Amino acid sequence: MIFELILISIVTYYFWHWTFWKRRGLPGPWGVPIFGKAGAMLEDSFPPGYTLQKWTKEYGKIYGFTEGMQKVMVISDPDLVQEILVKQYDNFYGRKHNPVQGDPDKDKDIHIVGAQGFRWKRLRTITAPAFSNGSIKKVLTTMEDSTQELMKKLREESENGKAVNMHLFYQEYTFDVISRVAMGQPDSQMFKNPLLKDVKGFFEHNRWQIWMFSGGFPFAVSFLKWLFIKVGKFGAGPFIVVQKSVTDAVMSRIAQREADKKHGVEPGEAADYIDMFLNARAEVEHFGESNDEFHKSSSYNNRQLTTQEIISQCFVFLVAGFDTTAISLSYVTYFLALNPKIQSKLQDEVDKECPNDEITFDQLSKLKYMDNVIKESLRLFPFASFANSRRCMRNTVIGEQIVEAGVDVMIDTWTLHHDKNVWGNDVEEFKPERWDSPLTPQQAYLSFGAGPRVCLGMRFALLEQKGLLSHILKKYTFETNAKTQLPIKLVGRATARPENLFLSLKPRV
């Protein structure tokens, strides 16, 4: 009898959750009991951004679905998007996250992407100086050195019109740059860095089992994380290798600092992100911040990091800084190859503003048309759109819709970026000139997010892309060939990356 009562209680609990949106009168895809539509969000061959677009066409600009035990609302109305990301940030300061990612407030290894409230503010404040114009200027020499290494390889590979998978080359470049800037790698290791294989595996391996089961059975998260990290189940291999590499690098630097201190040697100017974070290191395991009274205007003076937070920060910068910039470069290149007139116009700008072999920060700042080209590429392919998802932290109302605390809100960025009512009838055209118009709806452009949680590394990523593209376009013209996928096929979950990008590089005369 007791077993039957427990079983009935469990079934009732899951059914009550499954019908959450139905009881609130909001349309949306049903999914299956316990897991909801989690499977659709974990599909690798059909990026979730496409899935949300499909559902939005069917259910409208605001609808709901369940993803495991999490209740998810989807928004693509520009006014409501601004309400969530900017105007009501105090009510949506948390990010959507799966239980296996840990508790943003209590877990010791939460990084800036997953943190929220006062903890996020502390991490953001400490990290922000690394992405100021002054700091970025200092790493331009490193970027230039990695660029020259890539150019050598491109010269070898592009002879006689050979098809080159540009996405793989961009991955080599961006990983080389971020390894040197963030982790202190002294010299270029392009095309010979063994860690890159595991970093790629971190993104490419589909760990749907742990995401699915942790979402459907959040009470089992500790056990699932143990299986993942300690036993190596659910494709944990690449994650474990990368995590160990970052941990070893940080702990080695700490040991070196302690040895130097014994000999009276003080730390000099921070040479990389590890140094910068260690300058803020505190001898505590956890600060225990409470977000009960958090508001975006709240003052908070803690400027310290725990050792585990330093490791987590370095980890997220390494993997995120590598993946996103390589994907963006790939899509820009794809659109240039498809639009020869636009590519020619961009080459003219580069030739004019960057006449010498060495390219400076000030010269890159003058490449306004290149800014437009990158923006337009990211408008059409907002590949990291899930970074715009938020968690409702306090009961509130947006428009006429009640949103309860604990509900996740996903911004359907793909629909918003392809909305004729927002961008006009030429919305599907690759048209960089649209960004010259003062009427361009800047507030509807979310490739780097909006509001207080706008992408911290935006300026770094743009400089990295502009520097490399300038060097390539001074020497070559991108062209399609028989191996080019037309249209390009996108795959992936957290980010929508190209399956491949085979192009020819025609030397300029």
From Swiss-Prot:
GO MF: heme binding; iron ion binding; monooxygenase activity; oxidoreductase activity, acting on paired donors, with incorporation or reduction of molecular oxygen
Alphabetically ordered keywords of this record: Heme, Iron, Metal-binding, Monooxygenase, Oxidoreductase
Residues binding heme: C455
Listed EC numbers: 1.14.-.-
Database matches in InterPro entries: Cyt_P450, Cyt_P450_CS, Cyt_P450_E_grp-I, Cyt_P450_sf, Insect_CytP450_Detox
Cofactor: heme
Pfam family membership, one: p450
Top EC class, one word: oxidoreductase
Function (record text): Cytochromes P450 are a group of heme-thiolate monooxygenases. They oxidize a variety of structurally unrelated compounds, including steroids, fatty acids, and xenobiotics.
Sequence similarity: Belongs to the cytochrome P450 family.
Protein name: Putative cytochrome P450 CYP13A8
Organism: Caenorhabditis elegans
